[in-house]
Amino acid sequence: MDEEKRPKPLPPSLRGRRRYIAYQVISEDKFIFQDLINSIWHSLLNLLGELGASQADIWIVKDTYDEKKQIGIIRCSHNNVEQVRTALALIERIGDVRVVVKVLGISGSIKATQMKFFEETKLTEFTKTL
């Protein structure tokens, strides 16, 4: 595409405000990530309906899901954070596995969410400087 025909990106003042929700899945057994996505969408659609789910602007960030710790991030609109938290709390099963989805916290950027809720404290950060 030519540079002249490309649409201009929206300025930050016109973009939607987003929040990133860190969640942890506590389960009795292992499950497939795609089943988790299906359960989240099923819960959102049951609680909010199609119109509410589209207004919530949900995006499940696949690259940030840690299968070992079962921690992930969901992006949503700043107006719908509480509805998304409620939908996550209503998830009881992923496939045939009984689960509890715990919200770890909310942040305004993916980087801050990862630093707060994913990173383990490293002992090298506490070295004494003289």
Give the location of each predicted region.
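Short, low-order "capping/linker" segments at domain edges
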Residues: 110-130
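Surface-exposed, low-hydrophobicity interaction/linker segments
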Residues: 24-64, 113
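Beta-strand cores of modular interaction/reader domains in eukaryotic scaffold and signaling proteins
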Residues: 22-24, 73-75, 102
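N-terminal, charge-rich interaction modules
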Residues: 1-30
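A common structural junction motif
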Residues: 44, 90-99
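The conserved glycine-aromatic submotif of the RRM
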Residues: 65-73
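Helix N-cap motif at beta-to-alpha junctions
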Residues: 75-82
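Short proline/glycine- and acidic-rich turn/helix-capping motifs at secondary-structure junctions
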Residues: 96-117
